[in-house]
C-alpha cells in the first residue's frame, strides 16, 4: 500500500496530537451539556473513534452515511443518503464529525437536513479541510488540519474503498487513479 503513496502528509503522531487538542476544545465548549456526536460513515470512523475518547463529557453517538463520490476522485455534487440516524436530534446539541471537507456539497446537504430536524445547536468538526476546492459556502467549527489540494488516503480516507486502514494520511500517487 505504501508504494502507492507519493508521500506521508500527516504522521500518526501528528494526527493523534491534533485529535487530543480538538477533544479538549470540544470538552470546554460543551461543558455541562450532553452533546450527540454524529459520525459520517465510512471515512470518519477512525477519527470519530479517536476523537470521542478525548472528549471528557457524557456523550451520545449516532451514525449517518451519505456519499457524493462513489469511486471517483472528485465529488459529483449529487449527495445520496445511504443510512440515516437511528435517533432524534431535536433539542440536542449536535457535533457532526467528518473526515474531510473539500467541495462542501456533502456537508452542506447534511447541515440543511440536520437543521430541519431542529437541534438546539449544530457544529461541524472535520479532520481535514481543503478550502481551494470549496464550491458551496461552509465554515466548519473545528478543523484538524488545512491541507492543499491533494488526493489523500489513510486514517479512514479511501480511494475505491482501499487504504482506509493506513494509520497515517498520505498523498496517493496520481498514477494509481488517473487511468480509472
Predicted segments, located by residue:
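PRPP-associated nucleotide enzymes
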Residues: 1-180
